[in-house]
């Protein structure tokens, strides 16, 4: 059963402006520890696209959960990493798992698709669940 669907689209130049203005403070607010390691290994252009896709992805995950970003579910707490084939995989913290369990989701799967084509990045998330 589909529990939730979320999507988000972002203007990449907006992310570029925020990175230029706030630098590390902005990155630390958006990316998790594992994502920061990946971010630091990328070229400047790749970094901006990486952050834009992660920002859109995290927003779409929060929308699919049904809460949006809240004090118990921060952007940096959701990590979107890639498997060895490049497929994006969503990792969520215990707080989000507790939130999903509180709304009676005992078994769930989060699928996400990320794409960027300058000047836009988009994410689409589907949460499938057993209730």
UniProtKB/Swiss-Prot annotation:
It is found in: Cytoplasm. GO terms for molecular function: holo-[acyl-carrier-protein] synthase activity; magnesium ion binding. Gene3D superfamilies: 4'-phosphopantetheinyl transferase domain. Keywords: Cytoplasm, Fatty acid biosynthesis, Fatty acid metabolism, Lipid biosynthesis, Lipid metabolism, Magnesium, Metal-binding, Transferase. Mg(2+) binds at residues 8, 59. Transfers the 4'-phosphopantetheine moiety from coenzyme A to a Ser of acyl-carrier-protein. This is Holo-[acyl-carrier-protein] synthase. It comes from Orientia tsutsugamushi (strain Ikeda). The lineage of its organism: Bacteria, Pseudomonadati, Pseudomonadota, Alphaproteobacteria, Rickettsiales.
């Amino acid at each position: 059963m589909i529990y939730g669907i979320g999507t988000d689209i972002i203007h990449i130049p907006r992310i570029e402006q925020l990175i230029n203005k706030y630098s590390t403070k902005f990155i630390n607010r958006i990316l998790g520890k594992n994502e920061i390691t990946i971010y630091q290994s990328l070229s400047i252009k790749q970094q901006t696209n990486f952050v834009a896709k992660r920002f859109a992805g995290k927003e779409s995950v929060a929308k699919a959960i049904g809460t949006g970003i809240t004090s118990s579910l921060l952007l940096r707490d959701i990590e979107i990493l890639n498997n060895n084939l490049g497929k994006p995989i969503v990792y969520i913290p215990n707080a989000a798992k507790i939130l999903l369990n509180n709304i009676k989701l005992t078994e769930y799967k989060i699928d996400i698709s990320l794409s960027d084509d300058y000047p836009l990045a988009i994410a689409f998330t589907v949460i499938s669940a057993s209730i």
